[in-house]
């Protein structure tokens, strides 16, 4: 009887810790390059238009699309080097006449609103997710001006 209570208690405790450990893995490690620097390096390669960047599984996943196809680049957050790439399905087409994504991201970083964990074009605007002090914040920005929507 005691063993059943202990097993249930341990199982409940492990279940409660799961979201915390998953959340902790979604933030670039200390000493990482700023996302704006990562994006600027990808932009300089002229592979296409960057449609999103997300920190996941220890890498920045940067999606780049040209007229023919899209690919995801997996970039080490500390060194900024590309570790691998793969073809992927196209998403929404980015609006024309937008600011470079690295420029918009750099302006957000300069405001000190938190650590950017994701940035993507969605429904004609730029969606940015940040983390600071255990809180998650989402911004919607005009991709042409970088101003909040």
Which positions does each model-derived feature cover?
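Conserved histidines in hydrophobic membrane contexts and catalytic metal-binding motifs
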Residues: 60-63, 75, 80, 122, ...
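Hydrophobic/anchoring residues in structured secondary elements
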Residues: 52-55, 87, 118-121
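Cleavable N-terminal signal peptides
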Residues: 11-12, 22
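Mid-chain, structured segments of secreted extracytoplasmic proteins
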Residues: 65-110
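Extracytoplasmic
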Residues: 33, 45-48, 57-59, 68-70, ...
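Short, non-transmembrane alpha-helical segments in secretory-pathway proteins
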Residues: 26-50, 93-115
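Bacterial N-terminal signal peptides that target proteins for export
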Residues: 2-10
């Amino acid at each position: 009887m005691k063993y059943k209570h202990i097993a249930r208690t341990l199982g409940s405790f492990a279940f409660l810790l799961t979201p915390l450990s998953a959340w902790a893995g979604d933030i670039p490690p200390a000493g990482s390059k700023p996302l704006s620097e990562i994006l600027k390096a990808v932009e300089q390669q002229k592979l296409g238009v960057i449609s999103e960047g997300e920190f996941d599984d220890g890498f920045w996943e940067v999606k780049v699309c040209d007229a023919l196809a899209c690919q995801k680049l997996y970039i080490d957050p500390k060194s900024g080097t590309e570790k691998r790439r793969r073809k992927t399905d196209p998403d929404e087409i980015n609006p024309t006449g937008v600011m470079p994504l690295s420029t918009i991201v750099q302006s957000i970083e300069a405001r000190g609103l938190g650590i950017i964990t994701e940035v993507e074009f969605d429904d004609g605007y730029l969606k940015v997710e940040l983390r600071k002090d255990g809180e998650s914040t989402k911004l919607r920005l005009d991709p042409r001006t970088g101003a909040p929507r």
